[in-house]
Swiss-Prot record:
Assembly information from the UniProt record: Component of the TIM23 complex, at least composed of TIM23, TIM17, TIM50 and TIM21. Interacts with preproteins in transit.
BP terms from Gene Ontology: protein transport
Localization terms from the record: Mitochondrion inner membrane
Xref: InterPro entries: FCP1_dom, HAD-like_sf, HAD_sf, TIM50
Comp. bias intervals (Acidic residues): 71-80
Encoding gene (name): TIM50
Cleavable signal peptide: none
Organism per entry: Debaryomyces hansenii (strain ATCC 36239 / CBS 767 / BCRC 21394 / JCM 1990 / NBRC 0083 / IGC 2968) (Yeast)
Designated name of the protein: Mitochondrial import inner membrane translocase subunit TIM50
Length: 471
């Protein structure tokens, strides 16, 4: 009995010791190995989980809605609740970010907007004022807009003055596109302005050769012959970077073309490209323009000879145009505009001038009939010529019309000049290369501070070289 009691006591004490050990170790394990940070007691949960309820056939009516919201959140689209929460947070953040500095900035911004509005209204009202002078009215081309405070007159003055603010982009860079003319003793009688594209040259493109540029037939003779009567100015409609080399090829010795102007010297008016001859620094009464675009001569139509664009085919229009231009330059004309306007169709001026010349020749023969009658009669001059061995055929010639004499003289001068160019061509090319080498050494700093070399500087260098060669 006693023995059984001792065994029971040992068993109970062992159980109690084991229970005490177990109770003391559980909190220690929970403290060091649990990842939960919330120390509050967990709420009791039902053993009936969603999986068990689904297997048993029970479904939650709110489950589709929750699933749809879950799918939306998984797809990256916020749910309605999240949207409302986000809007509330943004509104709170905005109210919280509105500081006194922000309020001050808003006040200054509102004051700036108000000042800009008032200044704009005042500026518009000032530009609607009456013309300050007749010079301003003429300069802004507002002759048809009178002074007054009628709405249409005020709007007209406002439009003209606003348009003048943007003339920087539509006007040429310089008021005088050409330097002053040469002294009277060295000056050509007239100035001939000719366009480049589709009059003197024509550019064409194809898949085999690409871009090709051709000279019009008779161009060299046209420029060389008329250069003795006219100051020739090529006024192209294309940009200088594209046309400058072409002009250099047409006149490699700089013997025919006095100046070359390009698109940068044109004026933009009402969306049109206009060549304003009044900016050439030449007398308009002694200036002739030959162009293929109607917009080019819209400001001086009386000075223009319109021509049809050349398409690259063979023609002799330039050569046929020489007699009229030669006649115009060799006559004592003070103003060429009345003569040009006397033609019915200036685009057909070659044919009309040929008809006028034929009538003039017939009239001259009638008026000088006695000269033709005495041409074939024997006289003392024929007898002396036969004694000297001069053929009588060279003496007994029909009298020549003054126009024919002028043309013979012009042709003779042209031939002499061409001969001179051929003989001195290497010398001209060498001098030109020396000038390029001399002025090509100009540094960028010198070009910015002193500018490009002028014509006087180039002439001075040429004179110094000529003097050095003579010594």
């Amino acid at each position: 009995m006693l023995r059984n009691t001792r065994l029971l006591t040992r068993t109970i004490s062992s159980s109690l010791r084991f229970a005490a050990t177990k109770n003391t170790r559980l909190p220690t394990q929970h403290k060091f190995y649990s990842k939960k940070t919330d120390k509050k007691a967990e709420e009791p949960q039902s053993i009936l989980t969603d999986d068990l309820l689904a297997k048993a056939g029970f479904e939650d009516p709110n489950e589709p809605k929750e699933k749809s919201e879950q799918q939306e959140s998984e797809n990256g689209e916020p749910s309605e609740e999240e949207k409302s929460n986000g809007q509330e947070q943004r509104s709170r953040r905005k109210r919280r970010a509105q500081t006194s500095k922000d309020i001050q900035r808003e006040r200054y911004a509102n004051m700036f907007y108000l000042a800009t509005l008032v200044g704009g209204i005042a500026g518009v009202g000032y530009m609607c004022r009456d013309w300050d002078s007749e010079d301003e009215q003429t300069k802004l081309e507002g002759k048809d807009i009178d002074n007054g405070f009628a709405p249409n007159l005020m709007y007209g003055r406002l439009n003209k003055r606003l348009g003048s603010l943007f003339t920087f982009f539509s006007e040429p860079v310089f008021e005088n596109l050409l330097p002053p003319p040469a002294p009277e003793a060295y000056r050509r009688p007239l100035t001939l302005v000719v366009t480049l594209d589709d009059l003197l040259i024509h550019s064409d493109w194809d898949t085999k050769h690409g871009w090709r540029t051709g000279k019009r037939p008779g161009l060299d003779y046209f420029l060389g012959y008329l250069s003795q009567y006219y100051e020739i100015v090529i006024f192209g409609s294309n940009y200088q970077m594209y046309s400058e080399n072409t002009v250099g090829k047409l006149d490699p010795f700089h013997a025919y073309v006095s100046y070359a102007l390009f698109r940068e010297a044109c004026r933009y008016k009402d969306g049109k490209l206009v060549k304003d001859l009044s900016l050439l620094n030449r007398d308009l009464g002694k200036t002739v323009l030959i162009d293929v675009e109607e917009d080019s001569w819209s400001m001086q139509p009386d000075n223009a000879i319109p021509m049809k664009p050349w398409d690259g085919s063979y023609d002799d229009t330039l050569v046929k145009l020489i007699p009229f231009l030669e006649y115009l330059a060799t006559q004592p004309v003070k103003d060429v505009r009345p003569i040009l306007n006397s033609f019915k169709d200036k685009s057909n001026i070659v044919q009309e001038f040929a008809e006028r010349e034929a009538k003039l020749r017939e009239q001259w023969k009638k008026d000088n009939k006695h000269l033709f009658d005495s041409a074939n009669r024997p006289n003392a001059g024929n007898f002396l010529a036969s004694l000297m061995g001069v053929p009588t055929s060279s003496v007994n010639k029909e009298p020549k019309m003054p126009l024919d004499i002028i043309r013979e003289h012009g042709q003779l001068q042209y031939e002499h000049f061409q001969k001179y160019l051929k003989e001195n061509a290497p010398k001209f090319l060498e001098e030109e290369q020396k000038l390029k080498d001399e002025f090509g050494k100009v540094s960028l700093n010198k070009l910015i501070t002193e500018g490009a070399p002028s014509a006087d500087d180039i002439a001075k260098v040429q004179a110094e070289r000529a003097a050095a060669q003579q010594q």
